[in-house]
Design a protein with these regions (language model features):
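A short helix-loop-beta-strand connector motif used in the catalytic cores of GNAT acetyltransferases and
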Residues: 42-54, 75
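Conserved beta-strand in the GNAT
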Residues: 54, 60-68, 75-78
Length: 153
């Protein structure tokens, strides 16, 4: 998908180094030691082939969406745009493309987590007509104590 100088394309494992550099450049971005390492991102991409996307501008990755599903519903992870490229509707273009790909799989619902302190992200999702689900609490059970979260400062 091309729009001006932005290309939205499938994320490949060969993008990992550049994608990780982007994630590490975004203030407040949460990276997990195990889940976000090369091996686990490769496993995710292989399991959900063709669903994750990157935005490319001037031959540089400036946005990502990790997208996968379990057969019932999809989840978006690590939706981000380089802070220098915000305001260009890159996130909107990536979301549209990722939704089309999930829809083609016959999935009718997508969820995501937007951390409460991510004000820009929460404003974005509301502007895209996503509804905050106030009926649920989110829980997690850490099975690998080495899978610690770090937040980019």
């Amino acid at each position: 998908m091309m729009n001006k100088d932005i290309e939205i394309r499938t994320m490949k494992i060969e993008d990992y180094t550049e994608v990780m550099a982007l994630w590490k450049s975004i203030k407040g971005f949460r990276i997990r030691a195990v889940d976000d390492d090369f091996e686990h991102i490769k496993r995710f991409l292989d399991r959900n082939m063709g669903l994750s996307v990157v935005a490319v501008k001037n031959n540089q990755i400036v946005g990502t969406i990790l997208s996968g599903h379990d057969g019932r519903q999809a989840t978006f992870y690590h939706v981000c745009v380089d802070s220098k490229c915000r305001g260009e509707n890159i996130a909107g273009k990536m979301v549209k493309e990722a939704i089309e790909r999930v829809n083609a799989e016959g999935i009718s619902k997508i969820t995501l987590i937007a951390f409460k302190q991510n004000l820009a992200g929460n404003i974005f999702w509301k502007s895209q007509n996503w509804k905050q689900n106030k009926d649920i609490n989110s829980y997690e059970l850490v099975l690998n104590e080495e899978n610690i979260s770090s937040i980019v400062a």
